[in-house]
UniProtKB/Swiss-Prot annotation:
Known function: Subunit of the oligosaccharyl transferase (OST) complex that catalyzes the initial transfer of a defined glycan (Glc(3)Man(9)GlcNAc(2) in eukaryotes) from the lipid carrier dolichol-pyrophosphate to an asparagine residue within an Asn-X-Ser/Thr consensus motif in nascent polypeptide chains, the first step in protein N-glycosylation. N-glycosylation occurs cotranslationally and the complex associates with the Sec61 complex at the channel-forming translocon complex that mediates protein translocation across the endoplasmic reticulum (ER). All subunits are required for a maximal enzyme activity.
GO biological process: protein glycosylation; protein N-linked glycosylation; protein N-linked glycosylation via asparagine
Entry keyword annotation includes ATP-binding: no
Transmembrane residue ranges: 413-432
Keyword Transcription included in the entry's annotation: no
Subunit structure comment from the entry: Component of the oligosaccharyltransferase (OST) complex. OST exists in two different complex forms which contain common core subunits RPN1, RPN2, OST48, OST4, DAD1 and TMEM258, either STT3A or STT3B as catalytic subunits, and form-specific accessory subunits. STT3A complex assembly occurs through the formation of 3 subcomplexes. Subcomplex 1 contains RPN1 and TMEM258, subcomplex 2 contains the STT3A-specific subunits STT3A, DC2/OSTC, and KCP2 as well as the core subunit OST4, and subcomplex 3 contains RPN2, DAD1, and OST48.
InterPro entries: DDOST_48_kDa_subunit, OST48_MD, OST48_N
A Pfam family that the UniProt record links to this protein: OST48_MD
Originating organism: Mus musculus (Mouse)
Membrane topology, from the record: Single-pass type I membrane protein
Signal peptide per UniProt: 1-28
Name of the protein: Dolichyl-diphosphooligosaccharide--protein glycosyltransferase 48 kDa subunit
Functional pathway: Protein modification; protein glycosylation
Main location: endoplasmic reticulum
Length: 441
């Protein structure tokens, strides 16, 4: 059956259009939904959004109460990342709510949340789901010793020292930063949640309370328990960051000079907000600190292929390739604290892996115990995704032909056995050939 040439000519433009559409879809970066209180935030925080676009992110701006909002459709996530820059929202629009966002996190999505003193209930509930408790509405972090010279008198324009940052270059960046400018609501971490990260804390003189009221009760957060920026990496490697300040990401704070109001304090021409905001966004959106397992191999020393079963006390070699995502490309990971465990129920062997070229390997002797074992690498470090690799193998006992014919430690027993045999042989000869003398009359 032949195709009409006219149909073929018409089909070529359609094929070209389809290929162009597929090319655009494949070339698009991570899909990111940005929820705003109003679209003016897009202009007041343009530097931050521009940094995301320059890194290839596809941003979709919508107001938080837009009735067409949707994160999930037909069981599939419509976006890879979610940015909530709408602290005062009381009800999300469309089918987005706290439960939907929690499901998005459970599905591995990344979320960046910025609050303020005008925080609404939805963000407070979302924080509680992630082990973060925000202070009451209209409260602010106050520090009478570490406030900026441009503060209006309530001491809520905080100058946070970089010494209060989490010691994790993967999260906060590797370069030294100028002091951080902060104005917003304080947070407290759930002490029972080990996954919460105290990224930026207040100083020992900071506290969270109503700035226009006298203190009549103990503040919600005091001293270094006051969190300015907090993070979370879930067990499924989903990442969330909570900032108590929406102004932290603003152009005004990025370009502002900073100087503490204390006499003799150093003046900086620019804050460290921009560098920190970029570093945090790179981490939360999984541009940094992402690891993956490459090919894994194991075999007896001197061989190349793994056997069907190992034998106890075999000398084996284990190798694994671990890669890290860097600037959109997978490169070999450089770490000196990666351990291998040889586990049955409990580890029988635990040893460090040594890097050789682009892979990590180690040689060790199997224990004199047979059963079903696992080569296990369980690498969990601050700022990195959880890396786990498990390979199951069987270890059998020695065959009867593989045992030593004589065991040196048993030589005394061998000697006693052979001496007993020789003595019995001599005794038998003597006994059989001995003849009693006949008695004479």
């Amino acid at each position: 059956m032949k195709m009409d040439p006219r149909l073929a000519v018409r089909a070529w433009p359609l094929c070209g259009l389809l290929l162009a559409v597929l090319g655009c879809v494949c070339a698009s970066g991570p899909r990111t939904l940005v929820l705003l209180d109003n679209l003016n935030v897009r202009d007041t925080h343009s530097l931050f959004f521009r940094s995301l676009k320059d890194r290839g992110f596809e941003l979709t701006f919508k107001t938080a109460d837009d009735p067409s909002l949707s994160l999930i459709k037909y069981g599939e996530f419509l976006y890879d990342n979610l940015i909530i820059f709408s602290p005062s929202v009381e009800d999300f629009g469309g089918n987005i709510n706290v439960e939907t966002i929690s499901a998005f996190i459970d599905g591995g999505g990344s979320v960046l949340v910025a609050a303020s003193s005008d925080i609404g209930d939805p963000l407070r509930e979302l924080g509680s789901e992630c082990g973060i408790e925000f202070d009451e509405e209209k409260t602010a972090v106050i520090d009478h010793h570490n406030y900026d010279v441009s503060d209006l008198g309530q001491h809520t324009l905080i100058v946070a020292d970089t010494e209060n940052l989490l010691k994790a270059p993967t999260i906060v960046g590797k370069s030294s930063l100028n002091p951080i400018l902060f104005r917003g609501v304080g947070m407290v971490a759930d002490p029972d949640n080990p996954l919460v990260l105290d990224i930026l804390t207040g100083s020992s003189t900071s506290y969270s309370f109503f700035p226009d009221k006298p203190i009549t009760q103990y503040p919600h957060a005091v001293g270094r328990n006051t969190l300015l920026i907090a993070g979370l990496q879930a067990r499924n490697n989903a990442r969330v960051i909570f900032s108590g300040s929406l102004d932290f990401f603003s152009d005004a704070f990025f370009n502002s000079a900073v100087q503490k109001a204390t006499p003799g304090a150093q003046r900086y021409s620019q804050t460290g907000n921009y560098e920190l905001a970029v570093a945090l966004s790179r981490w939360v959106f999984k541009e940094e600190g992402v690891l993956r397992v490459g090919p894994v191999s194991h075999h007896r020393v001197g061989e190349m292929a793994p056997p069907n079963a190992y034998t106890v006390t075999d000398l084996v070699e284990y190798s694994i390739i671990i890669e890290q995502l860097s600037n959109g490309k997978w490169v070999p990971f450089d770490g000196d604290d990666i351990q291998l465990e040889f586990v049955r129920i409990d580890p029988f062997v635990r040893t460090f892996l040594k890097r050789k070229g682009g892979k990590y390997s180690v040689q060790f002797k199997l224990p004199d115990v047979y059963g079903v074992f696992q080569f296990k690498v369980d690498y969990n470090r601050l700022g990195y995704t959880h890396l786990y690799s498990s390979t199951q193998v069987s270890v059998r006992p020695l065959q009867h032909t593989q045992y030593e014919r004589f065991i040196p430690s048993a030589y005394p027993y061998y000697a006693s056995a052979f001496s007993m045999m020789a003595g019995l042989f001599i005794f038998s000869i003597v006994f059989l050939h001995m003849k009693e003398k006949e008695k004479s009359d």
